[in-house]
């Protein structure tokens, strides 16, 4: 009863299915939710284009997850990669674990956050006097099995971005202080957003994001009017608005859950894998991250459409998102908008433009 009352008073979130346009950003977010191993998404675009609204909307859309009750790491009751050490010990000792359903964690990382706030801290005094590892979890612990959102990621300290990307890639966070070490699961979808006018990310950091979506302000006057009207209507009667979209929200929720189940069975033919690597090679992409992410994203896209085999159309839809930020570019150029990727893709896959 208390939980239901709290839901009534929680801040209403604009429905994901009601968002007009910005298909590239919406697709990238959905694919990362289907397969978090894609490695997150970097969203770059103009101010006021709905970046934050869309990211909060996808978190609100997702189904609840089962976690061990009162556990700071949102531990899974059976998956060893998603549980903290205390839960592992409890299972080894044969203790029964109480679980609860919670909404997917959506953690905002403020620009002024310190390393201790992000990673967590160890109480050295307690460790020395009482001999216990007293750990105060940080934002990475909170974000386990959820979404970690960094607005204006291009303005965040580089060493903090490094920490976030390392945790997102490995799924673990390690805190070392005064010879004491603590490790806990930190598997999350990392979503960064920013405005290119305020500065770019270093290429090494950009490369670590699985996908890169670019969004532009809507130019069509009729679409602009629609966006303004829908936002005004939502602000006036949010609960009515949310109820109107509940059916579409549930349909998309079911589709994402089904895609997550189908994903392990999706196949990508050897010939297509070779062609993906040919595209990466011809574009002179450094390293192999581009190949790996494109393979994963293509499988997630096929699963999203209910197929168990990747098609050329699946690859065509995602390859620009996966590669555009990995190209070597002239310092005077703005980041490649994807034309170069599309051109090489069409050549290698023999598609007429």
Curated annotation (Swiss-Prot):
A GO cellular-component term linked to this record: chloroplast
GO molecular function, one term: ATP hydrolysis activity
Gene3D superfamilies, sorted: Magnesium chelatase subunit I, C-Terminal domain, P-loop containing nucleotide triphosphate hydrolases
SUPFAM superfamilies listed in its UniProt record: P-loop containing nucleoside triphosphate hydrolases
Pathway: Porphyrin-containing compound metabolism; chlorophyll biosynthesis
Localisation: Plastid, Chloroplast
Catalytic activity line of the entry: protoporphyrin IX + Mg(2+) + ATP + H2O = Mg-protoporphyrin IX + ADP + phosphate + 3 H(+)
A GO BP entry: photosynthesis
InterPro entries found in the cross-reference section: AAA+_ATPase, CHLI-like, ChlI/MoxR_AAA_lid, Mg_chelatase_ATPase-isu, Mg_chelatse_chII-like_cat_dom, P-loop_NTPase
Amino acids binding ATP: 45-52
Enzyme class label: ligase
Enzyme Commission number(s) from the entry: 6.6.1.1
Record has Transcription as a keyword: no
Keywords linked to the UniProt accession: ATP-binding, Chlorophyll biosynthesis, Chloroplast, Ligase, Nucleotide-binding, Photosynthesis, Plastid
Family: Belongs to the Mg-chelatase subunits D/I family.
Purpose: Involved in chlorophyll biosynthesis; introduces a magnesium ion into protoporphyrin IX to yield Mg-protoporphyrin IX.
Protein's UniProt name: Magnesium-chelatase subunit ChlI
Gene designation per UniProt: chlI
